[in-house]
Structures are given as structure tokens and as C-alpha cells.
From Swiss-Prot:
Reactions mediated catalytically: GTP + H2O = GDP + phosphate + H(+)
GO biological process: SRP-dependent cotranslational protein targeting to membrane
GO cellular component: cytoplasm; plasma membrane
HAMAP family noted in UniProt: FtsY
Key words, A-Z: Cell inner membrane, Cell membrane, Cytoplasm, GTP-binding, Hydrolase, Membrane, Nucleotide-binding, Receptor
Keyword Phosphoprotein: no
Record's protein name: Signal recognition particle receptor FtsY
Region of interest called Disordered, as start-end residue ranges on this chain: 1-31
Record flagged with keyword Transit peptide: no
Self-association state and partner proteins as the record states: Part of the signal recognition particle protein translocation system, which is composed of SRP and FtsY. SRP is a ribonucleoprotein composed of Ffh and a 4.5S RNA molecule.
């Protein structure tokens, strides 16, 4: 009996264990399935989340790209507009420059034409003014330039003509040597060829006298003191110089320093009214005081140029020469570097005596320039050659007529052409 029960129990145990195993397996399978399901759900959720984030990121990037595209497009549009505007401005600038340059060229051409016309007009007046000197020389030189063979007789005849034309011995000797050298150098044979040789020799001699007055760029008045003998044309030259400087855009003030002659003061005042220029004068007092007051007035008024007249005097009048030295000293007190220019006015009619005058005034004052007047009324045009040879003080201006425009800067070439052509 006992063995029966024991065998039965042994048979029940494996069945129970198998059932438990199956139950455990089923439970494990269920749990595994649940885990897998959970994992699957988590994976799907994660995938969905990632997908959403990716789509959001893509959308954000796409928006940014669009914004960049729009910004770039806007910048390109603005750049194109700026380029078009710049191109328009460049074209406008080109047109403006072309117009300005065209106007400037036109003005320059007009100025050149006016200058050439003026030169021609002055050359004609100069030639007309030197008629007496030219006619005298032409008549005397007719035999020299008549076509004969160049020999010693011809040279002697030429030398005589030069001496009688007031060129003086020193200038004549210089010219004769120069002409001989040119004849020898160029192999000239005929008297007709002497004219060119003489013209070039005379030009080379008087060319150093051609030193136009150049006004400095300064805010201080430029003081010009004029001296000379009575009747040389100082006062008239001052009036013409005032007009000449005004034409250059300069303001001018006149000092009536010829206190010896009431007529001189009145004449200068008439020139002042004619040119609308202030004249400083005194009914009493000396020349130095008038000139001092004139410089002070010019400094106060911002005047560019002071033209100071002085009384006429002969170099032999020693007390008057001392007086004009005083005028110079007083001008230096009024302005340390004044007078900036000291000019003697010469009457061309006095011929060789002009050289002596220049020497005397130069020794007394230290001349910086000359004005040679009345060349139209004399046959002594050779005086410039004498001056060039003996005392070569620069000839600032020459006068060949009574007109207000008949006082001009000295041009050596124009003078020689007018004298010998």
C-alpha cells in the first residue's frame, strides 16, 4: 500500500513542475511581449519626436534660407540702383567737367587772341612812335644796305650812322665788333645781309635791359618812387602807370610829392580823378612828408601800389639831390623795405645826356629801373644802346605817344624790329 502511494506521488511531481514551467514561460513571454511593445511604443514615440524635430529644423533652416535669399536679393537690388545712380553721377560729372574745360579753353583762347591782338596793336604803335628814329636811320643806312660789297668803307659808313644815332662810342664799338664777327662767321658778302647782322647785334646788346617789373604777392603796399629832371614826363608817367596797374586788378594810391610846383599837384589830382584813384597831397610841407603820409594811408586802406611823385631836379643841383635822398630815407621809416622800386624818368630827346642823368641818380639813390618817354618825338632812338653799354639799368617801360595806353613794358625784340625794319 505504501509503495503504491509513493509511486503515485513521484508521478505527480513532474507534471506539477511542467505546469509551473509553462506558467513561468507564459508569464515571461507575456512580460517579454509587453517589454517589446513598450520598446516599440517608445521607439515609435522617439521616432515621431525626432521626425518632428527634424521637420522643425528643416522648416527653420528653410525659413532662414528664404530670409537670406530675400536679403541677398534686396542687397543686389540696392547695389544695382547704387551702380545706376553712380553711373548717372559719373556721366553728369563728365558732362560738367567737359563743359568746364570747354569754357576754360574758350577763355584761354579768347585771352590768347586778345593778347595777340594787343601785341599787334602795341607793335604797330611802337613802330609808328619810332618813325622819326627809324626814318633817320633808314635814310642813313640806305647806302650801307644798298647791296654793295662788304668792305672797310662800308664798315666806316655804318659806324658813322650808329654814332649819329646817339648810340655813343662804347655801344658803337661793341656793335661794330659784333657785326664784323657775324659777317665773318656766316660768310656774309653783300651789304643787304648786314641788316640782319646789325639787328641781331643790337638785340643782344639791349636785351639785358628787358626786365619787366614783377609785383610780389604781399599784403603790404608796393612803393614806387619816381625821380627825374623837370619836363621828363614824371607826372604823366605816374598817371599812365596808375591806369596800367589798375588794368591788372591792383589798387593804386598817388603821392603828390612835387611840392615845388602847384601845377604838378593839380596835374596829378586830375590823373587821380581820371583813373578814380586817391591822391595824397599837402598845400604846405615837403615832399618827404607827403610821401610818408601816402604810405601810411596805403597801409591803413590795404592799397596794393603807391606811386610817389617827386620834384624835378638836375643832378648838378646838389641840395636838391640831398633832398631826394631824404625822401628815400623817410619812405624807409614809413615801411622798412620801401621804396621797393626807384625809377628815373628819362626824356629820350636829350640823347647822350640821358646816360649822365642815369649815372647821377643811380649813384644818389640806387636805381632799380628806368622809364624812357617821348620816343615818338625824337630821332635819337639809339639812346637805349648807349644806356645798355654804359649803365645797364633795366628799362621797365617806354612811352611812344600821348595816349594813356602808350606807356608799355620794354620789349627789346619789338623795339629793334620797329627801329630797323
Amino acid at each position: 500500500m505504501f509503495s503504491f502511494f509513493r509511486r503515485k506521488k513521484k508521478q505527480e511531481t513532474p507534471a506539477l513542475e511542467e505546469a509551473q514551467i509553462q506558467e513561468t514561460a507564459a508569464k515571461a513571454e507575456s512580460e517579454t511581449a509587453q517589454v517589446i511593445e513598450n520598446i516599440k511604443e517608445d521607439a515609435e514615440s522617439l521616432a515621431e519626436s525626432v521626425k518632428g524635430q527634424v521637420e522643425s529644423a528643416v522648416e527653420t533652416v528653410s525659413g532662414a534660407v528664404e530670409q537670406v535669399k530675400e536679403a541677398v536679393a534686396e542687397m543686389l537690388s540696392e547695389a544695382e540702383e547704387a551702380a545706376e545712380k553712380a553711373a548717372e553721377q559719373v556721366e553728369a560729372a563728365k558732362e560738367a567737367i567737359a563743359e568746364t574745360v570747354g569754357e576754360a579753353v574758350g577763355q584761354v583762347q579768347e585771352a590768347v587772341a586778345t593778347t595777340e591782338e594787343h601785341k599787334l596793336g602795341w607793335a604797330a604803335r611802337l613802330k609808328q612812335g619810332l618813325t622819326k628814329s627809324r626814318d633817320k636811320m633808314a635814310k642813313s643806312l640806305a647806302g650801307v644796305f644798298g647791296g654793295g660789297q662788304i668792305d672797310e668803307d662800308l664798315y666806316e659808313e655804318l659806324e658813322t650812322v650808329l654814332i649819329t644815332s646817339d648810340m655813343g662810342m662804347e655801344a658803337t664799338e661793341y656793335l661794330m665788333k659784333d657785326v664784323r664777327d657775324r659777317v665773318s662767321l656766316k660768310g656774309l658778302k653783300d651789304g643787304n645781309e648786314l641788316r640782319g647782322a646789325l639787328k641781331e647785334a643790337l638785340y643782344d646788346l639791349i636785351k639785358p635791359l628787358e626786365k619787366p617789373l614783377v609785383l610780389p604777392e604781399t599784403k603790404e603796399p608796393f612803393v614806387i618812387m619816381l625821380a627825374g629832371i623837370n619836363g621828363a614826363g614824371k607826372t604823366t608817367s605816374i598817371g599812365k602807370l596808375a591806369k596800367y596797374f589798375q588794368a591788372q586788378g591792383k589798387s593804386v594810391l598817388l603821392a603828390a610829392g612835387d611840392t615845388f610846383r602847384a601845377a604838378a599837384r593839380e596835374q596829378l589830382q586830375a590823373w587821380g580823378e581820371r583813373n578814380n584813384v586817391t591822391v595824397i597831397s599837402q598845400t604846405t610841407g615837403d615832399s618827404a612828408a607827403v610821401c610818408f603820409d601816402a604810405v601810411q594811408a596805403a597801409k591803413a586802406r590795404g592799397i596794393d601800389i603807391v606811386l610817389a611823385d617827386t620834384a624835378g631836379r638836375l643832378p648838378t643841383q646838389l641840395h636838391l639831390m640831398e633832398e631826394i635822398k631824404k625822401v628815400k630815407r623817410v619812405l624807409q621809416k614809413a615801411m622798412p623795405d620801401a621804396p621797393h622800386e626807384i625809377i628815373v624818368v628819362l626824356d629820350a630827346n636829350i640823347g647822350q645826356n640821358a646816360v649822365n642823368q642815369v649815372k647821377a641818380f643811380d649813384d644818389a639813390l640806387g636805381l632799380t629801373g628806368l622809364i624812357v618817354t617821348k620816343l615818338d618825338g625824337t630821332a635819337k632812338g639809339g639812346i637805349l644802346a648807349a644806356l645798355a653799354s654804359d649803365r645797364p639799368v633795366p628799362v621797365r617801360y617806354i612811352g611812344v605817344g600821348e595816349g594813356i595806353d602808350d606807356l608799355r613794358p620794354f620789349d627789346a625784340r619789338a623795339f629793334v624790329d620797329a627801329l630797323l625794319d
